[in-house]
Amino acid sequence: MPHTLAQKILQAHTDEEVREAGQIVNCHLSGVLANDITGPLAIKSFRAMGAAKVFDKDRVFLVMDHFTPQKDIDSANQVMVTRKFAQEMGVTHYYEGGDCGVEHALLPEQGLVKPGDLVIGADSHTCTYGGPGSRDVAAGMALGRLWFKVPPTIRVEFEGKMPKWLRGKDLILRLIGDIGVDGALYKALEFGGETLSELDVEARLCISNM
């Protein structure tokens, strides 16, 4: 049986043979993302692990996009913890204030991720980067690898011409309405069909991140 796209990506990042959905594989990471909410939690776990340095200062991405600017002392402290960690570890890609943007869009816009990469990011709405927890991100920052459960895949074909004024967000909201918010739990959605050829990268990123 041919591998799905998700399986091919996992296979490219592991020394094990990816055979079937449900299998646990240990993969090397292309990058690790955290923000000003999940970052301090990950940093706390990172230090609790006894880690002395990040696995690659060029492949850890810290984006302060929730509290920009900081609204109070607590949010300022969140950013300060992450900023000091970035300075201590020599993290190359730290974004705050005028250099910042929405984390989900910032990485591809800056050319920090590309097709075929395996990136994890801790955020409740980081489908693009897997959406793991802060402890997983801590392990990723320290080790540069993480375990993954090979997901079953749902193939979605979008056919027909896009009506005027509709965008990628409209497509994915309709799909969610059809399958339900829990319709693809622990599954990978792979998209195809002639409609996608009309969509720009921004619209495709929107579909992937919902």
Model-found features: residue ranges?
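Fe-S-dependent hydro-lyases/dehydratases of central metabolism
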Residues: 1-210
